[in-house]
Amino acid sequence: MANVSPLNFDRFDRQIRFLGKRAQKLISTTKVLMLGTGGGNSQVSIQLACMGIGELFLVDPDRWAETDRNRVFIPREFVGKRKVSTLKKLIEEYFPDVRVDGIVTKAEYLPDEIYKEADIIVVGTDTISSRIYANRKAIIYRKPALFPYASIYSEKGKLRQFFGVLQVYIPGKTPCFECWKNFDKYRLLAESLDPKRREEFRQRYNLGDELNIPVEASVSALNYIIAGAAVWEILKIITSIDKPIPLQAYNGISRSGRLMERINLKKDPNCPACSLARRLKSNSSLPSREDLIKLGEKR
């Protein structure tokens, strides 16, 4: 937990009315590790800052592009600059009571000390392989972790898919990211290979576009919905105001009338990350590049 100066309860009056002062103190002493600071996680970071979170670790190797501005509220002069440094500056300017650490790196290269120090991990990275890596770290250090994801797909001018998913991992209680197995085997395989080996696999297995890594469509409306759900789950974890939902989804083209639907998910007794067999096999459950390639070939 982060050390903070005395709280200005007036600033947090509206949330204290239902959370209480004790919960606000918990929020203001909590450290959250944000892996990825794109359209979704940047929103989660700002919302947490609004609510007075104690400390944010912002982790991302990338720079802002002009194409980010359709879903992220950033000034034009931020384009071309590091995401973490500019977001850190923005939060510190408007929320000086929040401590912000900006780290320009990938999740895979982040020092273990940061994973250990964080109270909660929010995994908003672009690649499946980095999400698997973060999942293993959450398991090793017994940290609650959230995995928000949004996807839009259209075909021949018709919207086919407009949905978001939020998974919450609570150590020892809920299924982990890899229990779900809901990731594209070809995408995982492509991410695990350098361009030369990717072409070798393409020829060996007679693959076409399956090993291409596409640029996905994205819009602020969908990111904000999933980000809002993530912040609420984070508040549940911090304050115990309600039980976290292990897996929920938003379907923007469904006629069910529900904003977020719960999805039943059970622990996989043979999960390569969190199963008892895996934990007994090794003290370190981090996947190697060869492990990722094998996962991609199997699924």
Question: Where are each of the predicted segments found?
Answer:
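Hydrophobic/aromatic anchor residues within beta-strands of the central parallel beta-sheet
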Residues: 100-102
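Glycine-rich adenosine-cofactor-binding loop
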Residues: 23-65
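Glycine-rich phosphate-binding loop and adjoining beta1-alpha1-beta2 segment
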Residues: 53-95
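Conserved SAM/SAH-binding loop
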Residues: 104-111
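Extreme N-terminal leader/targeting segments of oxidoreductases
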Residues: 1-25
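Glycine-rich phosphate/adenylate-binding loop
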Residues: 2-7, 26-33, 113-299
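A short helix->loop->beta-strand "cap" motif at the edges of active sites that frequently abuts
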Residues: 54, 98, 141-143
